[in-house]
Amino acid sequence: MKTLLRLFLVRVPLGIGMLCLVLSAALSLPVPVKADGLASVPLEIVDSDRTELGDGLAHYRYDVVVGSGKYDVVRIHRIVREDRPNKPVRTRDAVMLLHGNPGSFAGFVAPMVTGVSEMDHSIAIFLAKQDIDVWGMDFGWALVPPEETDFEFMGDWGLAKDVAHTEAALTFARSIRVDTGQGNGKLHVLGFSYGGQVGYTLLGNETVQPRGLRNVKGMIVLDVGVKLENEGDREFYCAMALIDQASLESDPPVYVNRIGSLFNLAAYLASTDPDGTSPIVAGLTNWQAVLFIGASTERITGQFWHMVGGYLDEYGVPSSLRFTEDQLFVATVGTTFAPYYPVRIDFDTEQMMCGAVDTPLDDGLSQITVPILHIGAKGGFGPSAYASSTFTASRDVTTITVQRLPDSDEAMDFGHVDTVLARDAETLVWQPILDWIMAHRENRP
């Protein structure tokens, strides 16, 4: 989540079947990737597996080396319906899901990972059941283990590196799709939160590539932006960019944001001692603290959005959540949030949202022409983030705002994370996404 709790806490060509036979062997694919000055390297699969999910669905996972650094490894996921094991159906289209920070791909399949709620209450499962070839990726920082203590490697790990890794993952996905009979068509990108900012930047970069070398044909942005309409919102991120710049330039420099580990701790305490006194939010129980962090995010960070809508008292303390099951949210916080991510990606995205700083990361925005679907939560980034698409040259832009309460109750309305977890997210968010994908489906022979 963007700068979450920062003001509250010091930042303390191979077939699927064949692939399953070579789990212990490294396979190099001749796909170069270059990020932040790193030399181009071939993609190398170092681990993979397949899991049957039921209802004819399977989950494939590939750990792929995309650079020369210790943690230059991404985890690429595929959830797809199959005719038989290792034989995907001929899908109707394909999409790559990109998660937020400090999240992971698991957030898109939270019920499956946490065991809370029905497994198919998941945007990834929902789309796969409709014969969409669903891909996803864990950014490399999401795979850094909790026991890591040396974060020098995060010093130059910024948005550009994640964009390059995503481009490599898209190329990888297309190569697998060719081998499993899906053709070589481009993919849509669906970016939630930070993933949407990666999507905008990636598409901007692709505009300088020949059309035949581009990987993306359309973009779905889920409650985030790279440009904001509201001046107060822009000023907030200008201020946060200065704070992050100071962290990066301090002696010693601070390269890591540890907010994910705080989330993990808060959720652990809520699960093991729900009625105990919270060491994280004074005056609340451990259970209340997690709900407060989710439903009253604004009161902690000063930002204009919250993660999940809640039933709030006059102090902003939620009795429960409005749209997402309490237990699902707590379990998601505890199991799908990565403990660490680089400060530099906050700095990079804050500069873009600030709008007052010249950054090369948004240089390609004005050349983007692909179709864009931008869905905002009224209690999240919402309509303010729709300004992002006005900086592009796309003539096919659709915006959808999910609003469940009157304007006067915006502080309790449908939130940022409700878009992927809410009880009625399938109707309000996922079905419109599916409809848009089908409306932009490429003709097939």
Which stretches of residues belong to each language-model region?
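N-terminal cap/lid segment of alpha/beta-hydrolase-fold proteins
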Residues: 38-90
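Short, surface-exposed "cap/lid" segments of acyl-processing enzymes
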Residues: 83-138
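Alpha/beta-hydrolase active-site loop
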Residues: 154-179
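Gly/Ala-rich beta-loop-alpha elbow adjacent to hydrolase catalytic centers
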Residues: 190-195, 199
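Active-site nucleophile loop of the alpha/beta-hydrolase fold
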Residues: 220-229
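Alpha/beta-hydrolase
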Residues: 234-385
